[in-house]
C-alpha cells in the first residue's frame, strides 16, 4: 500500500513538477495575483514590492552557495572520502542504506542545518557507490528528509533569536515579547525532543519501506560518481612550488583555528554560537587542511562551483516572492502573508492555536522559504495573539519554527544544495518527499494538539 502511494506521488511529481526555475516563475505569478486584493495594491505597486526585494537576499544567497561549495570541497578531500566510505560500508542492503542516510541526515540537520544539507547528500553518494540495487533518487530524498527537524534543532534561527530579547526582537513581535526565552523552553523542551525523536525513528523506516521494487529502481552508475584521482605533479617553477606549498595552507588553517577558538570561548555556549558564517568558516578551514596543498583546494572548489548554478539563479526570485508576500501599501497595512496568518489566528482557540500557527507557518513558508522572513511575517501577528490569549510564547515560536521547516519537504528552494551535490533535479526526489511531508505533518500536528491540551 505504502509503495503504491509513494510510486503514485513519484509519478505525479515527475510528470507535473517543472524545473525549479519554472516553479519560481509560477509561484511569482500566483502571489502577484493574490497580493492585489489581499494588500489592496495596484499591479504597479506589486511590481514595486517585487523589484525592491529581488536583491534583498544577496548576502544569504552567497552564504548558501558557500554551504554547497565549501562543504563539497571539504567532503571530497581524500581523508573525508575515506571516512564517508567507512560509514557507507555499514550499509549492506538497500533497506539499511536508506535507514543509515536518513538517520545521519536527520541528526546532522538537528545539530546544524548547513552541515545537515551537505553531509547527508555526500554520504548518499558514497553509499550509492557501494550498495547495489539501491534507488539513487530515494537515497538523496532520504538525506534531505532529515532537514525537516532543522528549525527544531540547535541552529534554529527563531529559537536562537529569542534567547536574547533586544529592541529589535520586541519590535518584531509587536511589543509582545519583552523577556528572553531559553533553549530549555524551545528546542530542548521535552515535547520538542520527543517529536524529533519520533521523526528520527519513523522517518528512516518510512523511507526504507518506500524503496521501489527491483524492476522500478533507478540506480546510478558508480563510475559516474567516482571523482578523478588527484595527480601529484613535480613542481618545477617557483609558481608551481608556491601552489603546492603545504605550509601556506597550514598558515590559513592556523589563523582560522585561532579565530574560532576565540569566537567560541567568548560565546560561552558553543552550540548557541553556531551560525551560517561560522559553519562556512569551519568548512573552509577543514577544506584547506584536508586537501593538502593550496592548488588542490582551488581545484576542489572549482569542481564544487559547478553545482551552485540553481542557487545563484533562483534565490533572487524567491527574494522577490518574499517581497510580494510581505509588501504593504502603507506601513503597518495588510499584506498577503499577514492575511494568511490572521485567518488562522481568527479561527483558533486556546487548544488549537499552536496547531493553526504551525499550519499557517507551513503555508507561508511555501512562499517565504526563509526562517528570518517567516519570523518577520508571523511574529507581529502570532506573538501578540499568544499573549492576549494567555498562552506560552515559547510554544508559539516553536510552532512557527516547525511550520517553517515542515513544508521545506515540498519546496525545492532548500533542496538545491543537496541536488547540486547529487546531480539530480527536484522532480527526482519530491515524490518521496511528499510522503515524508505527510508523516512529519501528522507527528507535529499531534504534538501541538497535545501541547495545546496541557
Name these PLM-found stretches:
Residues 94-109, 133-157, 161, 176-180, ...:
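Alpha-helical transmembrane segments of multi-pass membrane proteins
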Residues 94-130, 266-291:
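Alpha-helical transmembrane segments and their immediate interhelical/interface regions
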Residues 19, 54-61, 88-100, 131-139, ...:
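Membrane-interfacial loop-to-helix junctions in multi-pass transporters
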Residues 36, 60, 64, 72-77, ...:
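Transmembrane alpha-helical segments of multi-pass membrane transport proteins and ion-pumping complexes
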Residues 5-9, 42-50, 75-91, 124-136, ...:
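Flexible loop linkers connecting adjacent transmembrane helices
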Residues 123-218, 392, 414-447:
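Membrane-core helix-loop-helix motifs of multi-pass transport proteins
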Residues 90-123, 315-329, 338-384, 388-389:
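Hydrophobic alpha-helical transmembrane segments of multi-pass integral membrane proteins
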Residues 1-69, 188-201, 205-314, 435-438, ...:
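Hydrophobic transmembrane alpha-helices of multi-pass small-molecule transporters
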Amino acid at each position: 500500500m505504502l509503495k503504491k502511494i509513494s510510486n503514485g506521488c513519484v509519478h505525479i511529481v515527475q510528470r507535473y513538477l517543472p524545473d525549479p526555475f519554472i516553479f519560481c516563475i509560477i509561484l511569482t505569478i500566483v502571489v502577484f495575483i493574490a497580493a492585489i486584493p489581499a494588500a489592496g495594491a495596484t499591479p504597479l505597486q506589486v511590481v514595486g514590492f517585487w523589484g525592491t526585494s529581488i536583491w534583498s537576499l544577496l548576502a544569504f544567497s552567497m552564504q548558501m552557495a558557500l554551504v554547497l561549495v565549501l562543504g563539497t570541497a571539504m567532503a571530497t578531500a581524500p581523508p573525508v572520502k575515506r571516512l564517508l566510505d567507512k560509514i557507507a560500508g555499514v550499509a549492506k542492503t538497500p533497506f539499511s542504506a536508506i535507514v543509515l542516510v536518513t538517520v545521519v541526515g536527520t541528526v546532522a540537520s538537528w545539530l546544524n542545518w548547513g552541515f545537515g544539507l551537505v553531509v547527508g547528500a555526500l554520504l548518499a553518494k558514497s553509499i550509492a557507490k557501494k550498495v547495489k540495487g539501491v534507488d539513487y533518487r530515494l537515497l538523496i530524498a532520504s538525506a534531505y528528509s532529515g532537514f525537516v527537524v532543522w528549525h527544531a534543532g540547535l541552529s534554529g534561527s527563531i529559537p536562537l533569536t529569542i534567547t536574547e530579547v533586544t529592541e529589535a526582537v520586541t519590535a518584531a513581535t509587536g511589543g509582545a515579547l519583552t523577556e528572553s526565552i531559553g533553549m530549555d523552553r524551545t528546542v530542548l523542551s521535552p515535547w520538542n525532543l520527543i517529536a524529533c525523536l519520533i521523526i528520527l525513528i519513523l522517518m528512516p523506516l518510512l523511507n526504507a519501506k518506500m524503496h521501489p521494487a527491483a524492476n522500478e529502481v533507478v540506480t546510478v552508475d558508480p563510475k559516474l560518481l567516482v571523482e578523478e584521482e588527484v595527480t601529484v605533479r613535480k613542481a618545477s617553477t617557483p609558481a608551481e612550488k608556491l601552489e603546492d606549498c603545504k605550509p601556506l595552507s597550514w598558515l590559513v588553517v592556523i589563523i582560522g583555528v585561532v579565530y574560532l577558538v576565540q569566537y567560541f570561548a567568548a560565546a560561552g555556549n558553543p552550540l548557541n554560537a553556531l551560525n551560517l558564517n561560522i559553519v562556512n568558516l569551519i568548512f573552509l578551514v577543514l577544506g584547506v587542511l584536508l586537501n593538502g596543498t593550496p592548488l588542490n583546494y582551488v581545484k576542489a572548489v572549482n569542481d564544487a562551483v559547478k553545482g551552485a548554478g540553481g542557487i545563484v539563479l533562483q534565490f533572487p526570485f524567491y527574494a522577490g516572492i518574499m517581497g510580494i508576500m510581505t509588501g504593504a501599501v502603507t506601513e503597518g497595512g495588510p499584506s498577503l502573508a499577514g492575511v494568511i496568518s490572521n485567518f488562522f489566528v481568527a479561527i483558533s482557540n486556546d487548544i488549537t492555536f499552536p496547531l493553526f500557527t504551525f499550519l499557517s507557518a507551513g503555508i507561508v513558508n511555501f512562499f517565504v522559504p526563509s526562517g528570518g522572513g517567516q519570523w518577520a511575517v508571523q511574529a507581529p501577528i502570532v506573538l501578540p495573539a499568544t499573549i492576549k490569549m494567555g498562552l506560552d510564547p515559547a510554544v508559539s515560536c516553536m510552532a512557527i519554527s516547525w511550520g517553517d521547516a515542515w513544508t521545506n519537504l515540498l519546496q525545492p528552494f532548500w533542496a538545491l544544495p543537496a541536488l547540486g551535490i547529487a546531480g539530480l533535479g527536484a522532480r527526482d526526489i519530491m515524490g518521496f518527499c511528499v510522503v515524508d511531508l505527510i508523516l512529519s505533518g501528522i507527528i507535529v500536528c499531534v504534538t501541538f494538539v497535545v501541547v495545546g491540551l496541557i
